[in-house]
From Swiss-Prot:
<comment type="similarity">
    <text>Belongs to the RNA methyltransferase RlmH family.</text>
</comment>
<dbReference type="InterPro" id="IPR029026">
    <property type="entry name" value="tRNA_m1G_MTases_N"/>
</dbReference>
<keyword id="KW-0949">S-adenosyl-L-methionine</keyword>
<protein>
    <recommendedName>
        <fullName>Ribosomal RNA large subunit methyltransferase H</fullName>
        <ecNumber>2.1.1.177</ecNumber>
    </recommendedName>
</protein>
<keyword id="KW-0808">Transferase</keyword>
<dbReference type="GO" id="GO:0005737">
    <property type="term" value="C:cytoplasm"/>
</dbReference>
<feature type="binding site">
    <location>
        <position position="108"/>
    </location>
    <ligand>
        <name>S-adenosyl-L-methionine</name>
    </ligand>
</feature>
<keyword id="KW-0963">Cytoplasm</keyword>
<comment type="function">
    <text>Specifically methylates the pseudouridine at position 1915 (m3Psi1915) in 23S rRNA.</text>
</comment>
<dbReference type="Pfam" id="PF02590">
    <property type="entry name" value="SPOUT_MTase"/>
</dbReference>
<dbReference type="GO" id="GO:0070038">
    <property type="term" value="F:rRNA (pseudouridine-N3-)-methyltransferase activity"/>
</dbReference>
<dbReference type="InterPro" id="IPR029028">
    <property type="entry name" value="Alpha/beta_knot_MTases"/>
</dbReference>
<comment type="subunit">
    <text>Homodimer.</text>
</comment>
<keyword id="KW-0489">Methyltransferase</keyword>
<dbReference type="InterPro" id="IPR003742">
    <property type="entry name" value="RlmH-like"/>
</dbReference>
<feature type="binding site">
    <location>
        <begin position="127"/>
        <end position="132"/>
    </location>
    <ligand>
        <name>S-adenosyl-L-methionine</name>
    </ligand>
</feature>
<keyword id="KW-0698">rRNA processing</keyword>
Amino acid sequence: MRLQLIGIGRTKAGAERELTARYLERAGQAGRAIGFPSVELREIEESRARRGDERKAQEGKAIRALLQPASLIVAFDEHGRSIDSEGFADCLGQARDSGKAMMHFLIGGADGLEPALTESAAFVFAFGKMTWPHQLVRIMAAEQIYRAMTILGHHPYHRA
């Protein structure tokens, strides 16, 4: 199963970009041996619309253009449910075993995701009850994908 992290906004050079790239590279390396041959990041330009609902609609359209048919969608949203790292790894393992070819992880922009995307997602997760900057959520999602690969591959990175 291929994994694709889709985020609104382009990460500028610096710590955020480096951390995201590092965790996704590690996830790709760890995932190949356990049925996840690739992990990639796709960045979508932020909408310049004035109103939040218009921005979400435009960004949602751009996200939908990247979604593969019959893929599994995971949305990261502040209103999603909290899950621990082992539960997240179980989710990825079950998805891999379902026979689907692609899993998309969606991160909205400053206004969040278009409601139609969260409604169509198989899973909607939150990183706790706090609100996080979408660039930081990208790093956290990349790290949790890597952590899930290490849990599924019985690597000592995760020590819970």
